[in-house]
Amino acid sequence: MSVVHHLPPGWLLDHLSFINKVNYQLCQHQESFCSKNNPTSSVYMDSLQLDPGSPFGAPAMCFAPDFTTVSGNDDEGSCEVITEKYVFRSELFNVTKPYIVPAVHKERQQSNKNENLVTDYKQEVSVSVGKKRKRCIAFNQGELDAMEYHTKIRELILDGSSKLIQEGLRSGFLYPLVEKQDGSSGCITLPLDACNLSELCEMAKHLPSLNEMELQTLQLMGDDVSVIELDLSSQIIENNSSFSKMITLMGQKYLLPPQSSFLLSDISCMQPLLNCGKTFDAIVIDPPWENKSVKRSNRYSSLSPQQIKRMPIPKLAAADCLIVTWVTNRQKHLCFVKEELYPSWSVEVVAEWYWVKITNSGEFVFPLDSPHKKPYECLVLGRVKEKTPLALRNPDVRIPPVPDQKLIVSVPCVLHSHKPPLTEVLRDYIKPGGQCLELFARNLQPGWMSWGNEVLKFQHMDYFIALESGC
């Protein structure tokens, strides 16, 4: 369970626990002499090697490392299962102190002044227009709107988070910093992003296109070893087994969780998702919103609001589909989602939730009233307006209404934009056995379809470690 505590204000989540309960276990199944009369030998591999030389190159086999061996003997022969289990690197959730930006000393000297900006701006804007007064600090309309929005939800964030944090401290999930300080809380060396998945998607657009009949879902079965890189960028890939699988893409290894599926492509190549014959009961969207910091850092490409608006959500959404969109703290984006984006998709806004980011000791990762960065992000939840006539609805399927103003409190991953899992907090508001889809995903989840041009990013082997024998 990723839900550590569930209280009236919302949920306290354990993101790391959710990842590690996925069962990242590679299995190599060897059978020999399985028939007395017809001896055979076969190998079932859960590790697939894709030729890095060319999208059209021949595949090469690659075995997963051996770890645990379980063998059995009977009259029919002998069988052997070799497994190795992986867990996500725990230090990637080691957030012991609030985030410190460059020029620490200058920021600390200015912090007291910055804390007063939220209250000062009200006095600034109340000055009569006719009274000519030179302002020391000029706020644009977007900043004023953001400050006004913050004052409306501030007490909700503060009070609700405090209750969940106190419960986390009482249970021992969160802990005072002095209790667990050690030398391991220093700098964390992050893996290099050696495989640029978005560039691979861009390259795939210039390859010969497959016709619609060829755009079939590719299932990675136990004896499946004939996968090439072109397949990954043109087909939905499914791992329907109860074990993880490892693939090697452009020389980089990625772990695929059991019962997961994905499409690696950019927004111009979503057709396989539309052709798969599925509609979804929950769609979580984490758009790459335009903003100045993204442009400066060149970390990833962004989409304009109009590009996001043209996404084929109406074709992907089932009746009563729950739509969840992550929104940055820019009021321009929030208003766009509620007033333009959702109406264009025939989606009715039903709730706003907030993801509150805290340290391992329960502090906000940024000061709550910081004028620069807030310790929370917004989620806008909406429901697709009923497509099914009243007479055809299933009276046995009753989905409770989505509550408004709920908090999701968690320690964030230090990896940029690794959002917390929503599987368990959304479960009550989706019909049993519903199909779930994540758009602009950067990782995979069991039971979910995931799409994006970086959909395997956080499945990279460098983010995992193999458990030692006996763990």
From Swiss-Prot:
It catalyses: a 2'-O-methyladenosine in U2 snRNA + S-adenosyl-L-methionine = an N(6)-methyl-2'-O-methyladenosine in U2 snRNA + S-adenosyl-L-homocysteine + H(+); a 2'-deoxyadenosine in DNA + S-adenosyl-L-methionine = an N(6)-methyl-2'-deoxyadenosine in DNA + S-adenosyl-L-homocysteine + H(+). It holds the Pfam family MT-A70. It is found in: Nucleus. One of its GO terms (biological process) is regulation of mitochondrial transcription. GO terms for molecular function: nucleic acid binding; RNA methyltransferase activity; site-specific DNA-methyltransferase (adenine-specific) activity; U2 snRNA 2'-O-methyladenosine m6 methyltransferase activity. One of its GO terms (cellular component) is mitochondrial matrix. Keywords: Chromatin regulator, Methyltransferase, Nucleus, S-adenosyl-L-methionine, Transferase. InterPro entries: DNA_methylase_N6_adenine_CS, MT-A70-like. Disruption phenotype: Embryonic sublethality and craniofacial dysmorphism. Surviving mice display anatomical defects, including anophthalmia and craniofacial dysmorphism. Adult mice are moribund and exhibited splenomegaly with anemia and severe leukopenia, indicative of aberrant hematopoiesis. Its EC number is 2.1.1.72, 2.1.1.-. It comes from the Eukaryota. The keyword Transmembrane helix does not apply. Belongs to the MT-A70-like family. N(6)-adenine-specific methyltransferase that can methylate both RNAs and DNA. Acts as a N(6)-adenine-specific RNA methyltransferase by catalyzing formation of N6,2'-O-dimethyladenosine (m6A(m)) on internal positions of U2 small nuclear RNA (snRNA): methylates the 6th position of adenine residues with a pre-deposited 2'-O-methylation. Internal m6A(m) methylation of snRNAs regulates RNA splicing. Also able to act as a N(6)-adenine-specific DNA methyltransferase by mediating methylation of DNA on the 6th position of adenine (N(6)-methyladenosine). This is N(6)-adenine-specific methyltransferase METTL4.
